[in-house]
């Protein structure tokens, strides 16, 4: 049985979601897990996080499963996603609609950039939104975009004129196939990992 299949079955069997599998130098096998998400429950209750006990439970079961299948590794590490959780699947994007995320495109934005964005740019930060697009015979299919504003950061003690116009909102639509990487923006908040996005500056 392939490594990914072993890990997915073990993690799911214990009631968790598999986020990431990484093999590092020195034989380290790193597994990242998260608590499962039920569609339609976002914001209905306080967000819960993976605990040390959760990681220990998954570690014990994985040690047994990997030994049975003869997987070659030196050390196993099971951890929670952290504040910069990777987004890899459609369900991940559904889960974090309304959150601030960082995306890296496989190719520069090019002609779609318009006048306000550098055409060679590939990295963006903005609030994740769900859109819909037409796909021929398939009809309407889910799509995604991030929205941001390039408003200058207000320094402590700085007065902002009431006459200053707000910076225009910008949007970037994308499909998952166009992404090289996507992660939750690592913004520390006392409201938890899923705190609603603000107007943080986007990445160059």
UniProtKB/Swiss-Prot annotation:
The keyword Cytoplasm applies. Pfam families: RimP_N (PF02576). It is found in: Cytoplasm. GO terms for cellular component: cytosol. GO terms for biological process: ribosomal small subunit assembly; translation. It comes from the Bacteria. SUPFAM superfamilies: YhbC-like, C-terminal domain (SSF74942), YhbC-like, N-terminal domain (SSF75420). InterPro entries: Ribosome_maturation_RimP, RimP_C, RimP_C_sf, RimP_N, RimP_N_sf. Its main location: cytoplasm. Disulfide bonds: none annotated. Keywords: Cytoplasm, Ribosome biogenesis. The keyword Cytoplasm applies. Required for maturation of 30S ribosomal subunits. NCBIfam families: PRK00092.2-1, PRK14642.1. Belongs to the RimP family. This is Ribosome maturation factor RimP. The gene is rimP.
């Amino acid at each position: 049985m392939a490594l990914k299949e072993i890990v997915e079955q073990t993690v799911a069997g214990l009631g968790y979601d598999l986020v990431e599998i990484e093999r590092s130098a020195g034989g380290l096998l790193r597994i990242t897990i998260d608590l499962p998400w039920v569609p339609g429950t976002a914001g209905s209750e306080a967000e819960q996080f993976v605990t040390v006990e959760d990681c220990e439970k998954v570690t014990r079961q994985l040690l047994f499963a990997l030994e049975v299948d003869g997987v070659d590794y030196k050390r196993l590490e099971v951890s929670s996603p952290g504040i910069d959780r990777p987004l890899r699947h459609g369900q991940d994007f559904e889960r974090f609609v309304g959150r601030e995320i960082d995306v890296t495109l496989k190719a520069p934005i090019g002609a779609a950039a318009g006048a306000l964005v550098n055409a060679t740019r590939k990295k963006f930060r903005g609030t994740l939104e769900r859109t819909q697009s037409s796909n021929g015979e398939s009809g309407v299919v889910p799509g995604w975009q991030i929205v941001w504003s390039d408003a200058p950061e207000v320094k402590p003690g700085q007065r902002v004129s009431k006459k200053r116009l707000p910076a225009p909102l910008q949007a970037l639509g994308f499909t998952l196939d166009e992404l090289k990487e996507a992660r939750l923006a690592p913004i520390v908040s006392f409201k938890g990992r899923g705190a609603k996005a603000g107007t943080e500056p986007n990445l160059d």
